[in-house]
Amino acid sequence: MDRGPQDRPGLLRTWGPLAAVLAALAAVAVLVLAGDGTGTGSAGGATATTALPPGEGLPEEVLPFSVAEERGVADEIDWGPTCDPTTGVLRLPLSPAPQCFAPFTGDNGGASATGVTGDAIRVVVYLPQRNDPILSFIYRQIGNTDTPDKVFATYQGFNEILDRYYETYGRTVELVPYEATGNISDPVAAAADAETIARDLQPFAVVGGPLLTEAFSDTLAANRVLCISCGPGQPTSWYEERAPYVWDIAKNPQQNLMLVAEYVVKRLGGRPAVYGGEGVRGRERRLGYVYLSSTPQTEQLRRGFEAQLEEGGVELAETASYEDPVAIAARAGEIMARFRDAGITTVLYTGDPLAPQALTRAATEQGFFPEWVITGSSLVDTTIFGRTYDEQQWRRAFGPSNLFARVSPEVAGSGYLYRWWHGEPPPAQQSALILPNLQLLYAVLQGAGTELSPEQFRRTIFAADIVRGSVIAP
């Protein structure tokens, strides 16, 4: 594989391994436009089993390597130095490797949407408020020293790499920083920030956003501005109502809870607790549920989760919600006492990675040692946060996870890619969601062609084949 222009064997700094672990949050779906261009659905009366000509539905100027092979023209194309023509994938140390697209020549038609000219695609990078009290509290738990400046510099570094390798049809992605005016849970500031971005910066897209309020993504959608990873996860219907503007990287909470419900029904319900402590182990499981209520849709998600459990013959004996991951310490004792008195053997948890600190400490103080079911909530299943929970409690934790097998950051991952190209670690060592956000953006730009718009962005995603993952790249 070709090496970057400043290849040196420098090591990642102290928290480099975290970047590789946190990349699991992304669960990046690598988009490869190929085949019939309609996914597994139907179009124009054709069924999913109807054989269509190779590349049917693709814009004329968009030619993936696999389609060129099917058409028998791959050998006639000069794929350029960034493509490995023996495999049809880009010469990038990414897994799975992105497919090559034929180099574009000619006129791209100029402006095609707000923020899109003949030369550039304007993309705003949302940066958190400096010294955001909530983020500062979270960062202190894991020694994170990232600043907005470091985060934006890392975005720029990855953007340089992807701009070199992906086909964007004569346009360059232009990143514009925007620093938030409020903390990540402030809906008023979030809505005002979104209005300012839409009115004054007029971008094609925004990447990033406040993760504890939907006001930012909701306001951007109302202003017809596309955004990626710009707010907390929502039910599927929420995204559909705001289509084609709001996109996320990971599966949404509704999809995650469906997975958790299936796991609980098939593996836990009606069976004895085997990982609990004294007074719990051996008893038939009695479930309690603790969850973060951060959006108006949270209760809708909870009701759907309970309904799916009940369909499988499993009931939640107790539930408890919280809204503030920092203030949960004041309620943790009451929640755990209620669960203990209700005879709960098994605690299901969906929320932020901080609350289990207070919950597990409170449980131990009360001599209550239930099972803890990991549900794939962001970062809760990572070692770096797990080490901050009460050890006597977390030794009893198990359940489904979104994480993949660990790989040394010296041989793979976002930090490795950055170092491979720039010869030094990324400025923001712990901002592993940066690369997936840009990967999604560039993958869609490459498949969308010259007529770029939010609607074409959506069509491109839904026309893409699903690329199977692996134990190191789910």
Predicted regions span which residues?
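N-terminal extracellular/periplasmic Venus flytrap/periplasmic-binding protein-like
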Residues: 52-196
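Beta-alpha junction/loop-to-helix N-cap segments that form part of ligand/metal-binding clefts
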Residues: 150-156, 163-242, 249, 323-330, ...
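N-terminal export and membrane-targeting signals
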Residues: 2-24
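Second-shell loop/turn segments in exported
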Residues: 111-112, 137-149, 177-184, 244-251, ...
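C-terminal region of N-terminal signal peptides and the immediate post-cleavage residues
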Residues: 26-52
